[in-house]
Amino acid sequence: MDVRGIFGVKVGMSQIFTEQNECLPITIVYCEANQVAGIKTIAKDNYNATLLSFQTVDEKQLNKPKQGFFSKLKLEPHKYLREIRKMQGFELGKKITPQELFKIGEYVDVTSLTKGRGFTGAIKRWNFKIGPLGHGAGYPHRFQGSVQAGRGGSSAQRVFKGKKMSGHYGHEQVTIQNLFIVGFDEINKLVLVSGAIAGPEGGIVLIKTAKKKTGKIKDIKLAVQTVKAPQLKAPKKQKTKVETNQVNPKIEEEKTK
């Protein structure tokens, strides 16, 4: 399977309308051109892959190993280095844009990291049931309960691996399959992808060819929005007060008295 992919940054979500008045939720991904920083082959590395670098930064912001890596290959320094397996056919140093890899309506798989929620209990992490809140239930209303496998006899006197317990929740790699490309914004370097993508705003996103719907393209036509220019009204003429030097005779009489 010919694999094509590009890395970007999640900006946020919005919505867009088609010609059939269908409202599509979309995720906006900022995708600047990815640079081919390395090529791996079966003959040398036992597998095919393409190493991509993205998000341009000043060379001083990189550590010494990355500075040496880019200076040795005489490439533009980037903050991130990521590898995509089974991606072939690109020359070293080439800049890849999303318009070169995908078409509007093409199905893609999007990989990203979910939001990190820190150390949480079993109720939030695994959707366990809350304990009874009354009738002498005592203090542990939100505890996970017993974790042992059994009591004596032939039952195992240990806790099995993979037992659902309290622990670190979130910050896991998730792939959303069978989304499709809605559109491109070449000026602002944006890619519009249908549906929701896991992770926070500013998280790294990988857009790759769909594994299940390979080569399939969805027929999509967006509604063209026409905006009428506002009609400017002529400003109203302000009435100017004419100052006169005439003196009121009553005021002068009061002053003389």
From Swiss-Prot:
Protein name, as recorded: Large ribosomal subunit protein uL3
GO molecular function, one term: structural constituent of ribosome
Domain of life of the source: Bacteria
UniProt entry keywords in alphabetical sequence: Ribonucleoprotein, Ribosomal protein, RNA-binding, rRNA-binding
Function per UniProt: One of the primary rRNA binding proteins, it binds directly near the 3'-end of the 23S rRNA, where it nucleates assembly of the 50S subunit.
Gene this chain is encoded by: rplC
Family classification: Belongs to the universal ribosomal protein uL3 family.
Sequence segments annotated as region (Disordered): 232-257
Annotated GO CC locations: cytosolic large ribosomal subunit
PANTHER family, per the entry: 50S RIBOSOMAL PROTEIN L3, LARGE RIBOSOMAL SUBUNIT PROTEIN UL3C
InterPro entries on file: Ribosomal_L3_dom_3_arc_sf (IPR044892), Ribosomal_uL3 (IPR000597), Ribosomal_uL3_bac/org-type (IPR019927), Ribosomal_uL3_CS (IPR019926), Transl_B-barrel_sf (IPR009000)
Record text on subunit structure and interactions: Part of the 50S ribosomal subunit. Forms a cluster with proteins L14 and L19.
HAMAP family linked: Ribosomal_uL3_B
Any one GO BP annotation for this protein: translation
